């Protein structure tokens, strides 16, 4: 049935009679009904991809593309004088994730479904997400990010589980979202657990709330502030609630297919996405021993055969360690299992650094994952090598066979087919549409690397995308973009290791250059996007600096003809879908050795931006694929950085005192900025750079500045620049999440 006929049947109206909100609700229901007709993937073994976050983005467009009806719907609406892009704007973006971890999980479940693999996502149904970012007085403020409406993609189910805590139990309710594969007759689910007693009225000013009222707050927020005891306890409540539900679901579904639990590993594989779901290991063991009479040794060996751990970071702060007393306060029944697992390891191996419970009585989640899984993977070649040779070296020596690399990927359906419609249409005309299911087919573009005609068309498409971004930012943020400028973009959660502060120093130097009469050949627009965790003070200070610089520069008539700076408010997937296709320079400038992979680098590459980056994360593989002539690499390499950490060999003042650096850093506390901002914040950031600079901003600053200047010069040589653009798009196929998931499936889940 066509959509027009569907609407006529449901409402007795024509498409032209409905407003955009009404059209959205009708389209939502139409797509949900189409999805309902799909059979579930049903292989004997099922993958459970457990993740604290899924940054799924808006689903209407994604589902229309995967159903193969996007163009058809667009034409039907156009015939009724309606625009699908305007209908899409009605949808609220689900607040189920924050950064790269959640976006990766979303690309992965898309690929799992598109490849016809039997595999579901499992997480929590957060009502307010991380937070909605609002700027006021050049500072970030946090508000609840409500997104659940009466009409949404969530499907209610009758599935309920009892989750036991020390002093009470909670009954969960399961909501599902259909995960449609690209042009597939089958589907999977994203399983999101919730409680019916959630109460958003307990939220006070901003996003503060009573962290002790678990029955009302449990699924309110993603990553609630854990800077105090109650916050840490709430995180444990959340994580256990997620994994207990997951474990019960896994066992129920396996039993329904004939498992006797002794053979559970033949029916299920659990992929632990970072350390947040780690308690699924002891919880599965607990359920097997308590409910099914399986001996402890057999139970942990079953779990070991059906569990894999993906490590996403080498930052010690992100490898979770929970005080044993906190776990005893929340889930004492699980502590019994954890202590037994710790005893198993102590009976086999010496060495404090590999134990599950350390001498300070902290439970190391990553250590437990590594011991009691059969796979440990990093997410880019360099990251995995650092894990094996440095951060997890002791474990690699124990279990070399467990360690493997699975370089991250992105779904081209969302990050090209939807977000860059002009480029996708041209690629199909030029090389066909096979790349949507076999991304390596993008290499056919290499035949056109010297084509002036193709280069001219790509330039035209980039300009079209800049105009789309211009209209979007004017409507949503009041930003006036100059579409003739070079667009230089850094979009990531705010963290010192990602070094937004180094980019801010570049902006200061460029500002001072312009004030001194050194003018760029073409205007540059620098975009930042991302949120800082409310408890992460220095990250908030970096945001404050950028907002002050933005106010200063954009209102200075001497400078704003040549330079604009914007921090996009409440950056999310929807903003990324507009910003990435319009970008010329992709900022991937983390301190070498600190970024596990990154996926923004892949999205920019696919959409025709050139990378300015360190040899970190997946930048290393981009460099190898495109060749050094098609990427802009700068900075110290990971081996040297790791040695500097080992020897405490980096002293920021040595770099601060160099010509051209001192003036730039000192500008942070200049009168020009202080009068626009908060003196305490600016001085704190200044002192951090001067006296600590843990992530070595100043070590790479001069090289970074010089390399960006080289990029700006190369941009003026349009033939050279566009040749590099074609080479980057052509080589982006390796970074398809379909490739990543095929490797997971063949080398881990069904090994």
Language-model segments: residues:
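A conserved ligand/cofactor-binding region detector
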Residues: 1-751
């Amino acid at each position: 049935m066509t959509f027009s006929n569907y609407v006529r049947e449901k409402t007795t109206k024509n498409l032209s009679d409905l407003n955009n909100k009404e059209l959205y609700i009708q389209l939502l229901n139409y797509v949900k009904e189409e999805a309902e007709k799909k059979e579930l993937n049903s292989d004997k073994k099922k993958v459970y991809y457990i993740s604290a976050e899924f940054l799924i983005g808006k689903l209407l467009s994604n589902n229309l593309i995967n159903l193969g009806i996007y163009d058809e719907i667009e034409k039907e609406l156009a015939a009724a004088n309606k625009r699908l892009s305007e209908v899409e704007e009605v949808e609220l973006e689900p607040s189920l994730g924050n950064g790269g971890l959640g976006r990766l999980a979303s690309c992965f479940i898309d690929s799992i479904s598109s490849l016809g693999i039997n595999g579901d996502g499992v997480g929590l149904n957060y009502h307010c997400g991380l937070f909605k970012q609002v700027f006021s007085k050049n500072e970030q403020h946090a508000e609840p990010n409500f997104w659940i409406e009466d009409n949404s993609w969530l499907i209610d189910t009758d599935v309920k589980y009892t989750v036991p805590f020390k002093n009470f139990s909670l009954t969960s309710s399961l909501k599902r979202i259909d995960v449609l594969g690209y042009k597939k007759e089958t589907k999977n689910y994203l399983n999101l657990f919730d409680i019916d007693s959630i109460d958003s009225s307990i939220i006070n000013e901003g996003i503060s709330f009573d962290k002790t009222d678990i029955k009302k707050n449990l699924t309110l927020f993603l990553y609630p502030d854990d800077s105090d005891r109650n916050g840490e306890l709430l995180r444990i409540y959340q994580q256990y609630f997620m994994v207990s539900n997951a474990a019960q679901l896994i066992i129920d579904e396996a039993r329904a297919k004939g498992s006797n639990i002794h053979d559970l590993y033949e029916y299920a594989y659990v992929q632990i996405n970072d350390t947040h779901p780690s308690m699924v290991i002891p919880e599965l063991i607990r359920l097997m021993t308590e409910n099914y009479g399986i001996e402890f040794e057999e139970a942990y060996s079953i779990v070991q055969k059906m569990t894999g751990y993906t490590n996403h970071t080498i930052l010690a702060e992100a490898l979770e360690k929970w005080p044993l007393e906190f776990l005893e306060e929340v889930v004492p029944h699980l502590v019994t299992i954890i202590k037994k697992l710790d005893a198993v390891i102590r009976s086999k191996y010496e060495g404090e650094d590999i134990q599950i419970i350390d001498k300070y009585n902290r439970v190391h989640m990553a250590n437990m994952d590594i011991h009691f899984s059969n796979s440990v993977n990093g997410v880019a070649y360099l990251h995995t090598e650092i894990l094996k040779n440095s951060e997890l070296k002791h474990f690699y020596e124990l279990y070399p066979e467990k360690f493997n690399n699975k370089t991250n990927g992105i779904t081209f359906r969302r990050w090209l087919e939807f977000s860059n419609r002009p480029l996708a249409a041209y690629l199909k005309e030029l090389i066909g549409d096979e790349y949507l299911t076999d991304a390596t087919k993008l290499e056919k573009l290499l035949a056109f690397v010297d084509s002036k005609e193709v280069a001219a068309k790509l330039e035209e498409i980039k300009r079209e995308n800049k105009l789309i971004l211009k209209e979007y930012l004017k409507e949503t943020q009041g930003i006036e973009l100059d579409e003739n400028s070079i667009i230089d973009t850094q979009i990531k959660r705010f963290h010192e290791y990602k070094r937004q502060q180094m980019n801010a120093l570049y902006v200061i130097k460029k500002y001072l250059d312009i004030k001194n009469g050194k003018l760029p050949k073409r205007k540059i627009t620098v975009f930042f996007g991302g949120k800082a965790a409310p408890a992460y003070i220095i990250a908030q200070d970096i945001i404050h600096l950028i907002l002050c610089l933005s106010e200063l520069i954009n209102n200075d008539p001497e400078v704003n003809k040549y330079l604009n700076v914007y921090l996009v408010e409440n950056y999310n997937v929807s903003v990324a879908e507009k910003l990435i296709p319009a970008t010329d320079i992709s900022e991937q400038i983390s301190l070498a050795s600190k970024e596990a992979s990154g996926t923004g680098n892949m999205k920019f590459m696919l959409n025709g931006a050139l990378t300015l980056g360190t040899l970190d994360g997946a930048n290393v593989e981009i460099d190898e694929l495109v060749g050094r002539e098609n990427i802009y690499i700068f900075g110290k390499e990971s081996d040297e950085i790791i040695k500097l950490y080992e020897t405490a060999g980096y002293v920021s003042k040595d770099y601060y005192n160099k010509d051209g650096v001192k003036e730039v850093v000192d500008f942070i506390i200049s009168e020009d900025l202080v009068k626009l901002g908060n003196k305490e914040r600016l001085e704190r950031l200044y002192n951090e750079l001067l006296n600590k600079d843990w992530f070595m901003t100043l070590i790479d600053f001069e090289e970074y500045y010089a390399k960006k200047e080289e990029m700006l010069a190369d941009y003026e040589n349009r033939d050279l620049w566009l040749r590099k653009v074609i080479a980057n798009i052509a080589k982006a196929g390796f970074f398809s999440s379909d490739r990543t998931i095929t490797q997971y499936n063949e080398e881990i889940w069904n090994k």
